[in-house]
Amino acid sequence: MSAANMPAGFTDYKVADISLAAWGRRETIIAESEMPALMGLRRKYLTEQPLKGAKILGCIHMTIQTAVLIETLVALGAEVRWSSCNIFSTQDQAAASIAAAGIPVFAWKGETEEEYEWCLEQTILKDGQPWDANMILDDGGDLTELLHKKYPQVLDRVHGVTEETTTGVHRLLDMLAKGELKVPAINVNDSVTKSKNDNKYGCRHSLNDAIKRGTDHLLSGKQALVIGYGDVGKGSAQSLRQEGMIVKVTEVDPICAMQACMDGFELVSPFIDGINDGTEASIDKALLGKIDLIVTTTGNVNVCDANMLKALKKRAVVCNIGHFDNEIDTAFMRKNWAWEEVKPQVHKIHRTGAGSFDPQNDDYLILLAEGRLVNLGNATGHPSRIMDGSFANQVLAQIFLFEQKYADLSAEKKAERLTVEVLPKKLDEEVALEMVRGFGGVVTKLTKQQADYIGVTVEGPFKPHAYRY
């Protein structure tokens, strides 16, 4: 849809350039052909309209793939208001195409922190007043937190929140433990078809792409340090190994550390004997002095701290593929070192003091996306086929919670339902099956005898709840 086709008088949006809508529409049509699970759900539930009456507040990266998600939610009966969960991740043509379709959206690439907060507010507010929303779709937890702290009255009507990412799930679990969470949540992140596809295979595809776009560096033969070896770390390490890099991994979890060793990566620590006492003396300067690229993948804070940044090799590339920019101590860099913008989302950080700098100075770091998500700041993120699984899970999770009607329950029933849980395995398998069909694959069916032998039904689910894929 081009801007010319926008509903007359529609002004409930703010994007960078509405004239980009036709470009966004062309890309969205291509993305639809690469998202068989999501489009399969759209066709399957179109007549049933399971989200009719749903009013969804959405805050997730405003990309072309998200445009397909939004239009699927709308096709299944929902109304939505949308913003991006990251100041650099919006694809402006995608936001324009959604606005041109008459859907409220507030997102553009390169927002300031203040503009980001404003966009979150506009997601919640319609004509200056809180919209009568009844569902939340979040990525990272900023929207959920804002609703709890500033607009708690909105939550009285909300049936639940579906959370996309590790960081947001951690925040939800923390709120639940403290008795602060007011609505139930579905942990979309830990669905197998999200965590293994998006977190692992998506990062395998998009990390090296973003680094190369941002730096134009050849990566082969250089040394990389991947901080963290969860699903995101696993995909990131593979991504850099594919480029011919010499990849080292650092971990705090013995199980993930063992997996890194088994996968053939050298397990190291940036700290002498693995102990960070907060001083420069605890840093393994011999190790960090050889590192050409460091990437954080953890969702934790200051995993690349000031002392590590001081010890890194001259001209090393520093980036993050976790959710927030606090994995890298960018606050220290802003306070103590001079920043020189090379191009959007690429900075030389001169380690020669704050203020002025010599352009010929060679003691600098190259920081990508200001320490925020590198794959969406310096590139276009995961491909459509990867996001297909994640967003199909989001649709099923929205349907699941909307049908539960939490807001209409008695206080006693609400107390029982106030949880943070993953989708039922059967729905995870439904997404996986649609993805397999999209690849042209054929899944073998169990015979009744075989199903009985392993104690499952022919239709599934096929694995016990505790099974680790």
From Swiss-Prot:
* Record-listed substrate binding positions: T63, D139, E164, K194, D198
Q: Which reaction does it catalyse?
A: S-adenosyl-L-homocysteine + H2O = L-homocysteine + adenosine
Q: List, alphabetically, the GO terms of the cellular component aspect.
A: cytosol
Annotated residues that bind NAD(+) are located at 165-167, 199, 228-233, 251, 300, 321-323, 375
> What is a biological process (GO) this protein takes part in?
one-carbon metabolic process
Its keywords, alphabetically, are:
Cytoplasm, Hydrolase, NAD, One-carbon metabolism
Which InterPro entries does the UniProt record give?
Adenosylhomocyst_ase-like_sf, Adenosylhomocysteinase-like, Ado_hCys_hydrolase_NAD-bd, NAD(P)-bd_dom_sf, S-Ado-L-homoCys_hydrolase_CS
Q: Which cofactor does it need?
A: NAD(+)
Which cysteines pair up through disulfides? They are: none
What EC number(s) has UniProt assigned to this enzyme? 3.13.2.1
Q: Provide the cofactor note recorded for this chain's UniProt entry.
A: Binds 1 NAD(+) per subunit.
Query: Which segments cross the bilayer?
Result: none
Named from the GO MF annotations, one term is: adenosylhomocysteinase activity
Listed pathway(s): Amino-acid biosynthesis; L-homocysteine biosynthesis; L-homocysteine from S-adenosyl-L-homocysteine: step 1/1
The UniProt entry's sequence similarity note says: Belongs to the adenosylhomocysteinase family.
Spell out the PANTHER family in the cross-references. Answer: ADENOSYLHOMOCYSTEINASE
Protein name as it appears in the record:
Adenosylhomocysteinase
Q: Which organism is it from?
A: Pseudomonas putida (strain GB-1)
